[in-house]
């Protein structure tokens, strides 16, 4: 997120710092890069996702991309250092594309969803129900609070607009919302995927992903 220093920036800085150090240190780069996920994510327990192995795998892909290497999915059995010796040349250039989704880091956020929060007061007017063009809102007969039928909802957001208590929210996938080219959709697993025919590599998805699942490459 722009203007806010988060743990995502902390990891990003650590990755690029360690990659930069490699240029000034002696020794084989393949062995160095294999050890770096353990240096950046030390210990026995995870710091961010409660799974230290997943965290190290994500950092491993970030390290590869920081060296300009291609992203690999979780199903590809290869060490972090795969291809690094060929890429470790002064005239080397990153392997396109520049912006990549690390699929196993993606939270598979809903593309768009309308929620009734605990702020609903169960008011008498129920303007949310009145303005819904698909009659997707009903009432809980015990509490009087609104319930949205997600199968019928078309995510127009009219209910959120008229709620006097701002108790209805429209959630959108942050990376897709930030993309001015509408280049981000979902794959068969609900993970974010980039249409590179539309993508202009602006990086807005990268800075807006709360899970740090989108990374860029360096040369």
Region locations from a protein language model:
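Ferredoxin-type iron-sulfur electron-transfer modules and their immediate structural context
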Residues: 1-162, 166-178, 182-190
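Flanking helices and flexible, charged tails adjoining ferredoxin-like Fe-S electron-transfer domains
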Residues: 167-219
């Amino acid at each position: 997120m722009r203007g806010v220093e988060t743990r995502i920036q902390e990891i990003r800085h650590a990755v690029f710092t360690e990659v930069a150090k490699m240029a000034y240190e002696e020794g084989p780069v393949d062995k160095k890069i294999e050890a770096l996920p353990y240096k950046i994510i030390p210990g026995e327990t995870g710091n961010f996702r409660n799974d230290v192995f997943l965290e190290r795998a994500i950092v491993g892909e970030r390290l590869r991309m920081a060296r300009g290497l291609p992203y690999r999915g979780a199903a590809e059995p290869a060490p972090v250092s795969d291809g690094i010796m060929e890429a470790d040349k002064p005239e080397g250039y990153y392997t396109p594309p520049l912006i990549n989704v690390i699929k196993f880091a993606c939270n598979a956020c809903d593309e768009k969803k309308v929620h009734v929060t605990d702020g609903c007061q169960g008011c008498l007017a129920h303007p949310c129900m009145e303005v819904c063009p698909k009659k997707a809102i009903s009432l809980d007969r015990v509490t009087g609070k609104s319930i949205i039928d997600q199968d019928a909802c078309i995510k127009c957001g009219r209910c959120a607009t008229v709620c006097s208590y701002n108790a209805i929210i429209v959630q959108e996938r942050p990376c897709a919302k930030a993309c001015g080219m509408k280049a981000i959709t979902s794959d068969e697993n609900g993970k974010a995927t980039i249409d590179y025919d539309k993508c202009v590599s602006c990086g807005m998805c990268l800075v807006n992903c709360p899970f740090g699942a989108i990374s860029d490459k360096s040369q």
